[in-house]
């Protein structure tokens, strides 16, 4: 049995057509089904529907053989039991700092609100900047508006939400897209099967990119 971990939303919607190229099609609509384990048209392949931030955990610990996760999630994840063989070039966005429009950056310690705590620590450590990291799980845009933080680090797509709340994108930390991740033990035990799937997905990605 080959188990693939996916999260609902944009990543799932963009991944399903790629899996279809490999003949893997869910037997139920994952967006409408309440099931978290979904069979596919290949009897020995199933999909796990999990939270986006949990995909690497399921894969590293062998609950799933493969998964699809955003590079932002993988940058924040601290585990080591994963291969990242393929950039699927889907769900593209940017991981950026943002702050109030026209605000002057403080000269002392910077207060940064984010759910990407590990990313923030590495980013500012590389700059030699002293910062206080404030972990939030959502509504990041509020933090600078009410004085909780000087800046935020968050995923930015169009930037419209930032601008609607009086903020502006500032420094680019990373360009994000979704990646295929593979459990290291699964890659050894089911190498031929998984490598064939990787090769098929790579061809599908390249074909899309050319068109």
Curated annotation (Swiss-Prot):
<comment type="function">
    <text>Catalyzes the condensation of ATP and 5-phosphoribose 1-diphosphate to form N'-(5'-phosphoribosyl)-ATP (PR-ATP). Has a crucial role in the pathway because the rate of histidine biosynthesis seems to be controlled primarily by regulation of HisG enzymatic activity.</text>
</comment>
<comment type="pathway">
    <text>Amino-acid biosynthesis; L-histidine biosynthesis; L-histidine from 5-phospho-alpha-D-ribose 1-diphosphate: step 1/9.</text>
</comment>
<dbReference type="GO" id="GO:0000105">
    <property type="term" value="P:L-histidine biosynthetic process"/>
</dbReference>
<comment type="subunit">
    <text>Heteromultimer composed of HisG and HisZ subunits.</text>
</comment>
<dbReference type="GO" id="GO:0005737">
    <property type="term" value="C:cytoplasm"/>
</dbReference>
<keyword id="KW-0368">Histidine biosynthesis</keyword>
<keyword id="KW-0963">Cytoplasm</keyword>
<dbReference type="InterPro" id="IPR013820">
    <property type="entry name" value="ATP_PRibTrfase_cat"/>
</dbReference>
<dbReference type="InterPro" id="IPR001348">
    <property type="entry name" value="ATP_PRibTrfase_HisG"/>
</dbReference>
<keyword id="KW-0547">Nucleotide-binding</keyword>
<dbReference type="GO" id="GO:0003879">
    <property type="term" value="F:ATP phosphoribosyltransferase activity"/>
</dbReference>
<dbReference type="InterPro" id="IPR024893">
    <property type="entry name" value="ATP_PRibTrfase_HisG_short"/>
</dbReference>
<keyword id="KW-0028">Amino-acid biosynthesis</keyword>
<dbReference type="InterPro" id="IPR018198">
    <property type="entry name" value="ATP_PRibTrfase_CS"/>
</dbReference>
<dbReference type="GO" id="GO:0005524">
    <property type="term" value="F:ATP binding"/>
</dbReference>
<keyword id="KW-0808">Transferase</keyword>
<protein>
    <recommendedName>
        <fullName>ATP phosphoribosyltransferase</fullName>
        <ecNumber>2.4.2.17</ecNumber>
    </recommendedName>
</protein>
<comment type="similarity">
    <text>Belongs to the ATP phosphoribosyltransferase family. Short subfamily.</text>
</comment>
<keyword id="KW-0328">Glycosyltransferase</keyword>
<keyword id="KW-0067">ATP-binding</keyword>
<dbReference type="Pfam" id="PF01634">
    <property type="entry name" value="HisG"/>
</dbReference>
């Amino acid at each position: 049995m080959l188990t693939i971990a996916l999260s609902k939303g944009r990543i799932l919607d963009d991944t399903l057509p790629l899996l279809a190229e490999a003949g893997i099609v869910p037997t139920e609509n994952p967006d409408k089904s309440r099931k978290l384990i979904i069979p596919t048209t290949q009897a020995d392949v199933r999909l796990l529907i999990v939270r986006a931030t949990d995909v690497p955990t399921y894969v590293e610990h062998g609950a799933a053989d493969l998964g699809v996760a955003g590079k932002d999630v993988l940058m924040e994840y601290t585990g080591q039991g994963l291969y990242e063989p393929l950039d699927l070039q889907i769900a593209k966005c940017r991981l950026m700092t943002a702050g109030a429009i026209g605000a002057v950056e403080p000269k002392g310690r910077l207060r940064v609100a984010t759910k990407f705590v590990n990313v923030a620590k590495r980013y500012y450590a590389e700059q030699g900047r002293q910062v206080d990291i404030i972990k939030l799980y959502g509504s990041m845009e509020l933090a600078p508006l009410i004085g909780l933080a000087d800046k935020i680090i968050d995923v930015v797509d169009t930037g419209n939400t930032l601008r609607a709340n009086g903020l502006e994108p500032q420094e680019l930390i990373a360009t994000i897209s979704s990646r295929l991740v593979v459990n290291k033990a699964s890659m050894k035990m089911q190498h031929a099967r998984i490598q064939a799937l990787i090769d098929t997905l790579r061809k599908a990605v390249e074909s899309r990119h050319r068109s």
